Amino acid sequence: MESLLKVMLLGSSGGIGRAFMNILAQNDISNSIIPHGTKLVLVDRCKDIVVSDQLKKKYAVSFISDVNISSHSDLEKLLIQHQINVLIEVADIETIEFVRVCTSLGVLYLNSGYGVWPDVYAREHPRCLMLVRALEIRNAIINRGAKSSTGVILGSGMNPGIVNALVERGIQRLANLNFIDKNELAADLKYIIFTEEDTTAIPTESKFNDSDFPITWNPQHAFAEFTEQSTGYVSQGRVQWINSRPLDCKFDVVCNDKVINGILVPHEEAVTIGEKYPNVTSGFIYSIPDITARHLPKVRNLKLINPVLLVPKNFELDGYDTVGVLLQTTRYGAYWLGYRNYHHEAAHYDTNATLMQVAAGVLAGTGILLRQFSRISVVEDLDHQIYLDTVCHILGPIVERQIMTDQLFHGFEHQRVGIIR
C-alpha cells in the first residue's frame, strides 16, 4: 500500500506548505509517516514552487504550478488526472466541497483549517464568517463516529488541531491528579479556553506602509478574523454572540506562566469542542504581537490590505508563540497545557514558530490519516496520544501546569472593550 501512495500537497508555496515540506525533509519522524520514495505532487497558484534538495532526494517530487482552483470541478479534474489518493490541503480553500469531492473519489483528505472559496472573505467580510462557517461545516459533514468511504480529518493544524488533542490529554491528566475517572472530570468542566500569546518582534523594526499588515501567519485570514463585525464563544453547545469586533473585545486569561490580555477571536475549535462537551463554555483568546496590533487601526478594508508574512527569510525575528488550552472545573481545579516555541527554534526549518506549530499538526494528522482511517473526523476524536507523540518530535515537550486560584478565568461577562482603535 505504501508504494501506491500518491500524495498531493495543495498550497505548497504558502507559509504552512513550506514549513511542512522542510519538516518532511529534515525531521526523522516523517520517515514513519510518508515513506521514502513516495510520489509527492506539489501544487500552488504561484508560478515557481521552490523545494530543497533534501526533499527531492527523499521523495519522487513533481510540480503543478500556476494553478487556480475555483470550483469543485477544478479539484476533481486535478485529482483524477494525476491519480491522487491522498490530499493534504493547506491552502485555506473551500472545505465542504473539498470533502464531497474527496469522499466521492475515495481520496484521503486532510486540511489545516476550515476554508472558503478565495473570493468569499472579501465579499462577505465583516460578517461573522468564521463561527458561521464552522457551524455550517459541522452541520453538513461532521457526524461523530460515522463511517465514510474514505478518511477525512478536518482542522489538523495548531488551532484548530493540536489544541483539540491537548483538550483530551488535559482531561485525563487533571482526572489523574484528582484520582477520579476522566468522564467524571469532563462532566465537571466549566471552561475550555484556548489561549495564545505571540510575542513576535523585529529588533530593528522595518518601515511598514499604512496598508501593510504584518503577522506570523496568513495575513488576510488573520485580518478577516480580527475585524469581523461581531465575535463570540460557545456555551451549552450554542454560539453566543458579542456585539463587538474581536479586536475590541479583550479578556484576561492564563497562558502558560502568565496571565495575558487577549482578544476574543471566533475560531473553529470552539465550535467542535463546544459540541463534544456541551456543558462547557469555550472560546479562543489571543494576545497578538504588538507589531500587528499597531497596524490594525491603519487598515480598515480587507480588499486594501498588503499582506506581510513575518518569516526569517525576510525579517530577523525575536520572541515566541505560546499556544495551549485552559481546562477549568467547578470542583477539581484548573490545568493549562500547551507549547511554547521560539522563532530561533523554527529557523532550522526556515520558518517561524507559528507556522512550525501548524505544520506539526498537519504531519501528526497525516500520520493518523494514513493508518487505514475511514471516517470524517476532527482532531479531538482521534487518538490524542499518537497524535501528540508526533507533535512532540517537532515542537518539543508539552508544557503543563496546575493553575492557582488567583489565575482562574472569570467568564466572558468580564470583558474589556475598546482597547484597539
Describe the residue ranges of each PLM region.
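Rossmann-fold NAD(P)-binding glycine/threonine-rich loop
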Residues: 113-148
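N-terminal Rossmann NAD(P)H-binding glycine-rich loop of SDR-like oxidoreductase domains
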Residues: 7-26
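Beta-loop-alpha module in the N-terminal Rossmann-like domain of NAD(P)-dependent dehydrogenases
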Residues: 73-74, 86-101, 117
